[in-house]
Amino acid sequence: IHDVYEGPNGVKLNFYYKNDPKIIENWKAVQPVTAELMEFFNDNIGVYPYKQYSVVQGGDGGMEYSMLTLVNYGDEFVPLVSVTSHELAHAWFQGVLATNEMNHEWMDEGAASFFGDLAESFVLGSNFNNSIRSSYARYISLANSGQEMPQSTNANRYKYNRAYESTAYSKGFVFLSQLRYIIGLDAFNETIKNYYNTYKFTHPLPNDLRRIAEQSSGILLNWYLTDWTQTTNKINYAINQVEQSKNKSKITLERIGLMPMPLEVLVKYKDGTEEFYYIPISLMRGEKKQPSYAKSWTQVKDWSWAYKKYTFEVNSRLEYIKSIDINPTGL
């Protein structure tokens, strides 16, 4: 069966699938959803530059090509949408930006995973935070397995297939999720649009993405790109000590892993109020703006990356504090 559905900006969406009663309903239903997905990518990445795109039943799982994806799904609607969304996202990152898949596979697969899941959550009304947690879980599993290799490893040089897959897809996803955390949502959105419009059809490198993010945020990010992609250093922080200091409380944090990261520490009080304490790292030479989820936001002095411990004060006696959490959003 060949159906044609009109997508955004007059793009012709072709759907080729088997004449099988078990799948026809889902393949009909996915057509307007595909148009919504394309509209989402247009709005959040940049405009799709071609006049057509085809979704074809075939292959094994899903596979992207320029202006075409093969999808071997149909019995269930949500998996069909999920794979279509991921493969369609490749039209921007593999088809238009066209990063080198051998040297920087995470720039395509990680971005397609991140934006594919983000678009899916938008059109289906699902919770994108679940995708974030799943990607973190897969990355952490790899990081704790002893099989992880640096993300800058050539795609053909990974010792284990699992290491390639988790590094390209999950760790690539987490790279973008953490970038959004570091520079803030507005700067992140601006970064992606400027990156696409600046580097489409030019085969950008990781440093090109970094520079665009720095320009959009006013934050230096070489430390982030270096540690995350060229090493297997891990991010791990803990609360080391909490003590009374006259009418204030001193909170001492400890960096356990080798990789530095700006921190958001949420202090909840017994009276029901709460306050975020934002700790930039000195390598950033800047800071992000107060996020919408933080009702109260206090920026304290930078944490110099070389020091393992850091202490800051809270304007409350210890007995009035209910809880202290590092990065409570988990994002």
Regions found by a protein language model. Name each.
Residues I1-S85, F114-D117:
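Hydrophobic helix-coil surface modules that form long, contiguous segments used
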Residues G10-K12, V47-Y53, A89, I183-F188, ...:
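Loop/turn elements at helix/coil->beta-strand transitions in domains of secreted/extracellular proteins
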Residues N19-A29, L70, E101-M102, R162-E165, ...:
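Second-shell loop/turn segments in exported
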Residues V33-N44, G74, V83, E87-A91, ...:
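Generic, well-ordered alpha-helical scaffold segments in large soluble proteins
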Residues L70-S134:
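Zinc-dependent metallopeptidase catalytic helix centered on the HExxH motif
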Residues E109-V174, Q178, I182, Y199:
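Acidic/His/Gly-enriched intrinsically disordered linker/tail segments
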Residues E165-I251, E275:
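Amphipathic alpha-helical substructures
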Residues N222, I235-N327:
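Beta-strand-rich binding/interaction modules
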